[in-house]
A protein has these predicted regions:
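Charge-dense, helix-prone N-terminal extensions
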Residues: 1-108
Length: 108
């Protein structure tokens, strides 16, 4: 099982999460919280929707982790490289944060 496969399998088991096609048209399924997509894959990388407020709150932590990059300054998303188990754990940790940040934002 690749790190990306492991992330999707374990992410889909998080409370309140379902797996469904991405609204962005990526091939693997995405992770959804209600009607809000909170994570999707790009081969061996995962984009996680932390929200802009969440990204600002975690700025120092995110900047200190070389595996993580911000998509764009005005984006709700960060991208995490998935190379091994530690990366999968980090991506799942950020996905749990995304769940908390996205509750009540269209994520019914």
């Amino acid at each position: 099982m690749t790190p990306a496969d492991a992330f999707l399998a374990r992410g889909a088991m998080l409370r309140g999460i379902r797996s469904a096609p991405s609204r962005f048209g990526t091939h693997p399924p995405a992770l959804w919280l209600g009607s809000r997509e909170i994570a999707h894959l790009h081969r061996d990388e995962v984009d996680v929707r932390l929200t802009r407020v969440g990204i600002r709150a975690l700025r120092a932590e995110l900047l200190s982790d070389a595996r993580i990059e911000r998509r764009r300054p005005s984006s709700d998303w960060v991208r995490i490289r998935l190379r091994g188990e530690a990366d999968v754990e980090r991506a799942l940790e950020l996905t749990r944060t995304a769940i908390r940040r996205n509750r009540g934002r269209g994520a019914v």
